């Protein structure tokens, strides 16, 4: 095995050496003067043809620009057309289609989530409004019932009695009846008159003493 490996290595090194020798060989010494002249003539001919082709290409490009200008095709329009074509080509690729489908699916999920949140908020506000309305209805219904209760009537009678006694003290005429709001108003008025009478009594006594 070792001998075979060494033989292969020696063969490869000899082959590489032969290639190096070939590249270093000067081919000019292997051709005749006539062949050199023919090759030089062919080279000059090729250079002339290339130069002519370049001139023809430049003339054709100039003519192309003139035609586009006459047709109103500007450079910007050409760029737009190229961009549109590139965009169309990109949209037809499988990678773009897969990415577009993924983003579309994600957008649908986001829209559904936002819709669910909006529905929940609307439902919450609706429940709060219904609760407020029902509370107002219960409150309006419970007020007459409360005023007709024995406890409230007893309190109302006590207030009326107090108003009557206050009016008697200040020399007013006593009368019963009326709504509870009128009774409370009469109580406040009677209390004010009682306070005013209390402040005037000492002045009368001082005048009598004088």
Curated annotation (Swiss-Prot):
Annotated protein name in UniProt: Tumor protein D53 homolog
Comp. bias regions, Polar residues: 185-197
Record PANTHER family: TUMOR PROTEIN D52, TUMOR PROTEIN D53
Organism: Gallus gallus (Chicken)
GO cellular component: cytoplasm; early endosome; perinuclear region of cytoplasm
Single GO biological process annotation from the record: positive regulation of JNK cascade
Residues covered by region (Disordered): 185-210
Gene Ontology molecular functions: protein homodimerization activity
Family as reported in the entry's similarity comment: Belongs to the TPD52 family.
Pfam families in the record: TPD52 (PF04201)
InterPro entries for the chain: TPD52
Coiled coil: 22-73
The UniProt record lists the keyword Lipid metabolism: no
Subunit structure as annotated in this protein's UniProt entry: Forms a homodimer or heterodimer with other members of the family.
Domain of life from the UniProt record: Eukaryota
Keywords for this protein: Coiled coil
């Amino acid at each position: 095995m070792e001998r075979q490996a060494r033989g292969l290595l020696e063969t490869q090194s000899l082959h590489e050496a032969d290639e190096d020798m070939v590249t270093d060989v000067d081919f000019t010494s292997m051709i005749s003067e006539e062949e050199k002249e023919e090759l030089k003539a062919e080279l000059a001919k090729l250079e002339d043809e290339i130069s002519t082709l370049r001139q023809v290409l430049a003339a054709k490009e100039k003519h192309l620009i003139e035609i586009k200008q006459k047709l109103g095709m500007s450079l910007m329009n050409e760029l737009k057309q190229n961009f549109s074509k590139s965009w169309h080509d990109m949209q037809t690729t499988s990678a773009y289609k897969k990415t577009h489908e993924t983003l579309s699916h994600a957008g649908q999920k986001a829209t559904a989530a936002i819709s669910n949140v909006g529905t929940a908020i609307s439902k919450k506000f609706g429940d709060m409004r219904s609760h407020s309305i029902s509370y107002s209805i219960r409150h309006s219904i419970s007020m007459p019932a409360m005023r007709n209760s024995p406890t409230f009537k007893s309190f109302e009678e006590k207030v009326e009695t107090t108003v009557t006694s206050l009016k008697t003290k200040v020399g007013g005429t006593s009368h019963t009846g009326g709504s509870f709001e009128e009774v409370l108003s009469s109580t406040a008025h009677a209390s004010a008159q009682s306070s005013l009478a209390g402040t005037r009594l000492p002045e009368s006594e001082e005048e009598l003493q004088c």
